[in-house]
Amino acid sequence: DESGFLEEPVLLTNTHSVGAVYEASIQWRRQRGYHPQDAGQGWASLPVVAETWDGRLNDIHGHHIRAQHVFAALDQAHAGRVEEGNVGGGTGMVCHGFKGGIGTASRLLPGGDTLGVLVQANYGRREDLQITGVPVGSRIRGYEMSIQQPSPYQGNSIIVVIATDA
C-alpha cells in the first residue's frame, strides 16, 4: 500500500549534480535519524531531485556541489517564506534572455487550504516573451545579458513544484 504522502525532501540542482545531491540527501536522512532503527534493510529513501541545465552561467562540469552543501541546505530548511531569485538552484538560470531564478506564488483556497507553487525558470528566447498576450520580448532592446553563450540544446527547462496543506 502506498501512503500518498511525500516523505522526502524535494531538491533542485543542476544537471550534473543530480547524483551527488541524491546520495547526500540519503546520507543526511540516515544521519539525522530518519532511518528507523528496526527497519533493517527494509528502509529505503527515495529523494526527489529535479534538475535544470545551468551551463550558460555556471561551470557545470566542475561538479562543485558536495555533500556538505546538501547537508547545509537541508539543515537550514524551514517553514514559511523561502528565498527567491538568484539563490540555490536558481543561481544559473536564464529565462527569456534575462537572468532567471526561483519564484513562488500561493493562494488561500475556499475552505482554508493553501496551494503553493515554486518555479525554477530556465527557458525561452527573448523574442518569444509575452505578457498577457502582448509580445513584449520583441520590443525590449538594450538589456542583453553580458554572457551570451548560447545553449547547445534546442529545448530548455522549467521546474514547477506544486504543494498544498490540504
Where would I find each of the regions flagged by the language model?
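Alpha/propeptide regions of enzymes that mature by internal proteolysis
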Residues: 1-166
